[in-house]
Amino acid sequence: MLKKILLSFLMIGFISANTPKVVLITGTAHGIGKSTAKYLLDKGHIVYGGDILVNENLYLNDIGGIALEMDVTNQEHVDNAISRIIAEQGRIDVLVNNAGIAVGSAIEDVSMEDAMYQFEVNLFGIGRTVKAVLPHMRAQGSGTIINISSVLGKAYNPLGGWYVASKHALEGWSDVLRLEVKQFGIDVVIIEPGLIKTNISNASAKYYQKYSKNSEYGN
């Protein structure tokens, strides 16, 4: 599945460009974000990777990338990351919104605090980052925004209602954004991975252990 995702970047087209692209990827400490960062660096692009897991993200500095401390729920973190990239590179060509969490439990069982945090990361964190990047892409007259959604942005299954809702919301939001920014030469792409064994899967299982394993929904 990871290979298919990376190949989809080839299909988007920016990788084959003669000029290296300046790319910001969120959630690069593990999983899809880490594999994507390595892949794009191998292709000669300039890659900044943001993650809340600062120490686990430092590998980027050793392979030619730039690691950033970036919690997408923190406006200051987002603003500082974008400001640094613009100061150092003068532009941002590609934004890959990959950071996300999965609350894997029954809708009734999950606290509203965790339900809202699900949306804070998976939707509003993306919105926060996109809003910070768009003025620069509009000034450039070009840019690509890639939102990592999920097959569950189109489908659904039990014990994941809040996650499914956040991805369905992201899909509709991305479709509207695409229509709004097309006039500025900016494209918006949605990638919908299937099940991949990454840290987000492990985290989802922990939420299940916390909430639904011993509830009426887990029996």
Model regions and ranges:
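Conserved glycine-rich cofactor-binding loop
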Residues: 29-30
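Residue(s) in the substrate-gating loop at a strand-loop-helix junction
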Residues: 150
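SDR active-site lid
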Residues: 183-219
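A glycine-rich helix->loop->beta "capping" turn
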Residues: 84-95, 103
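The beta1-alpha1 cofactor-binding region of Rossmann-like NAD(H)/NADP(H)-dependent oxidoreductases
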Residues: 70-80, 112
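Substrate-binding pocket helix/loop in short-chain dehydrogenase/reductase
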Residues: 106-107, 114-116
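Active-site helix of classical SDR
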Residues: 130, 166
